[in-house]
């Protein structure tokens, strides 16, 4: 691929903020996005922005008691577009951004900070009931049904006497029919655990040696295909989730991507083989996954095992001197993306030529 054919990552708009931004998410079916974080005075903030004539217009600012760590629209309908958030106090809230004074749903979900959140069953993505998953420093991963108050529908926690590990990232997947659904969770010690929500059982676990910063399936609403896990020390792993070997688990390929922590991974909504990784030195890398000729083979005992593919770097750019802490592709406009970094700047990016790859 020549330099002219390569995708380019262009910083379209950048805006400095007066608070630390932990997460940013596009509002579905709009040119708007929300940013979440905390003011220096210790309170939480949600801001709603719209792109207008190449600039950002602040539509709404909502201040809350506790700093807000993460958010998702994944469990809401396209009509309501409610935002679910996790905060430093362990609270899960669902907000109507049109009337944000009181949450439409509120539960003290965890004893400590909610580090990560994901949603499924909303926005027409994923079969089955809408659900939210939260992962916390208290070591637990909980699944919530927004229609059911107070109690989680599933609670994955260490058995008594086992060390509680800090859960840093959670992701839904495999929601291709009404029954099937999995949650994948990554922890500070490098553990990755795959929970089967239909059978309420641990389906698979592995350890990638370094703390797991971000996990994402290439698609939530199909039979599990690929899972990307990013970690401290600049590495990420791509697991082929189609074939599970009874002892070897899933085949994987790893790549040393950045010279520092890989904070985030996000797959392009319009092409599941492309994904962006965001690094601790302020860099973004755009990758393409190539499948092997055969995705499975038989081992010496005749049991099917997966075969990993390869990843190639399409483009990289350094946007900041600080870590890029959050990243979100627009579900509606191919190549449009928003990211936030710890230099208190939010950037709207355009990635070109993605339809040519």
Curated annotation (Swiss-Prot):
Q: Name one Pfam family in it.
A: WD40
Gene Ontology terms for molecular function: ubiquitin binding
State the Gene Ontology BP annotations.
Answer: apoptotic process; axonemal dynein complex assembly; protein stabilization
- Which key words are in the record? Apoptosis, Cytoplasm, Repeat, WD repeat
- Location in the cell: Dynein axonemal particle
A GO CC annotation recorded here is:
dynein axonemal particle
Alphabetical list of PROSITE patterns matching this protein:
WD_REPEATS_2, WD_REPEATS_REGION
InterPro entries xref list: WD40/YVTN_repeat-like_dom_sf (IPR015943), WD40_repeat_dom_sf (IPR036322), WD40_rpt (IPR001680)
Q: In which tissues is it expressed?
A: Widely expressed with the highest expression in testis.
Q: WD repeat boundaries?
A: 63-105, 115-154, 162-205, 207-249, 257-297, 319-357
Q: What is its main location?
A: other
Task: Name the source's superkingdom.
Answer: Eukaryota
Q: How does it assemble?
A: Component of the PAQosome complex which is responsible for the biogenesis of several protein complexes and which consists of R2TP complex members RUVBL1, RUVBL2, RPAP3 and PIH1D1, URI complex members PFDN2, PFDN6, PDRG1, UXT and URI1 as well as ASDURF, POLR2E and DNAAF10/WDR92. Interacts with PIH1D1; the interaction associates DNAAF10 with the R2TP complex. Interacts with several dynein axonemal assembly factors.
Q: Give the function comment from the record.
A: Key assembly factor specifically required for the stability of axonemal dynein heavy chains in cytoplasm.
Put simply, this protein is called Dynein axonemal assembly factor 10
């Amino acid at each position: 691929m020549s330099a002219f054919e390569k995708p380019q990552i262009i910083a379209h708009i950048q805006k400095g903020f007066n608070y630390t931004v932990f997460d940013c998410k596009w509002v579905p079916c709009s040119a708007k996005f929300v940013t979440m974080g905390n003011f220096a005075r210790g309170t939480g903030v949600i801001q709603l922005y719209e792109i207008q004539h190449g600039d950002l217009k602040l539509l709404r600012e909502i201040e809350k008691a506790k700093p807000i760590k993460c958010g998702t629209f994944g469990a809401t309908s396209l009509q309501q577009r409610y935002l679910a958030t996790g905060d430093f106090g362990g609270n899960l809230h669902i907000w109507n951004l049109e009337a944000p004074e009181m949450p439409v749903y509120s539960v003290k979900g965890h004893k400590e900070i909610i580090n990560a959140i994901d949603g499924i069953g909303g926005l027409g993505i994923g079969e089955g009931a809408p659900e939210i998953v939260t992962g916390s420093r208290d070591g637990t991963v909980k699944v919530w049904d927004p229609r059911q108050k107070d109690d989680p529908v599933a609670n994955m926690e260490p058995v008594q006497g086992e060390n509680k590990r800090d859960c840093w990232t959670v992701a839904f997947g495999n929601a291709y029919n009404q029954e099937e659904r999995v949650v994948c969770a990554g922890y500070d010690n490098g553990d990755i655990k795959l929970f089967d929500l239909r059978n309420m059982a641990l389906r698979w676990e592995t350890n990638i040696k370094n703390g797991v910063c971000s996990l994402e399936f290439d698609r939530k609403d199909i039979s599990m295909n690929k899972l990307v896990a990013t970690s401290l020390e600049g590495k990420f792993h791509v697991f082929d989730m189609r074939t599970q070997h009874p002892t070897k688990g899933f085949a994987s390929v790893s790549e040393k991507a950045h010279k520092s922590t890989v904070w985030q991974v996000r797959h392009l909504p319009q092409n599941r083989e492309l994904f962006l990784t965001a690094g601790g030195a302020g860099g973004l890398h755009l990758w393409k996954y190539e499948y092997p000729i055969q995705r499975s083979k038989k081992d010496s005992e005749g049991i099917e095992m997966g075969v990993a593919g390869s990843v190639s770097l399409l483009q990289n750019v350094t946007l900041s001197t600080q870590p890029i802490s959050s990243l979100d592709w627009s579900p509606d406009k191919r190549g449009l993306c928003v990211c936030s970094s710890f230099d208190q700047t939010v950037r709207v990016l355009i990635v070109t030529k993605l339809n040519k790859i």
